[in-house]
A protein has these predicted regions:
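Short, contiguous alpha-helical
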Residues: 1-12, 20-39, 43-93, 133-171
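Acidic/histidine-rich alpha-helical segments that form the ligand environment
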Residues: 92-131, 141-147
Length: 171
């Protein structure tokens, strides 16, 4: 039987109240949306580059967002000394390049594991806590807003990629 990407449980969060549960809920929703868009596709479909003008693929987006989570929440916000997921010496787009369809199940699991590790890394931080990012003070709140924007942008790309792969829209 051919492996296909699993369908995630829908994420839900509060509609009012303090910033943290709202932003955590919205980030969770964006995270689940990416996996929803990928759900049911085989590794070959996830690794496909269906738009001739772009190196984007669904598998590349999964890998990219795992890298983004690690950088922003674990390395920058929490100060964890974790290794980068991809070697920048090989090029800045290693998350999108040299994709192996057989690695799709592992990439999706790695993304989910990165979510858990990232959430745990910042659980003890306050939303007003700041970290220096290239000479600018970023609050954890701003990092969450940045990540939500990053996911929203790439989920739009993912919608187009999914439609180009198999015609499915609106996931």
């Amino acid at each position: 039987m051919t492996w296909t990407a699993p369908t995630p449980q829908p994420a839900d969060g509060p509609l009012r109240g303090p910033d943290r549960p709202i932003l955590e809920g919205y980030l969770g929703w964006e995270r689940a949306t990416l996996l929803n868009i990928c759900a049911g596709l085989a590794g070959e479909q996830l690794a496909a580059h269906p738009l001739p003008s772009s190196n984007l693929s669904l598998l590349g987006l999964v890998r990219h967002l795992a890298k983004v989570e690690r950088i922003w929440l674990r390395q920058r916000a929490a100060g964890e000394p974790v290794e980068p997921l991809y070697d920048r010496a090989l090029g800045k787009d290693q998350d999108f390049d040299h994709l192996d369809p057989d690695e799709a199940p592992g990439a999706i699991e790695a993304l989910k594991e990165e979510w858990l590790a990232a959430d745990a890394a910042v659980a003890g931080l306050g939303f007003d806590d700041t970290v220096d990012v290239h000479g600018e003070a970023f609050s954890l709140r701003m990092i969450y807003v940045h990540l939500i924007g990053e996911y929203a942008r790439h989920n739009g790309h993912a919608d187009l990629l999914r439609e180009a792969v198999d015609g499915v829209t609106g996931r």
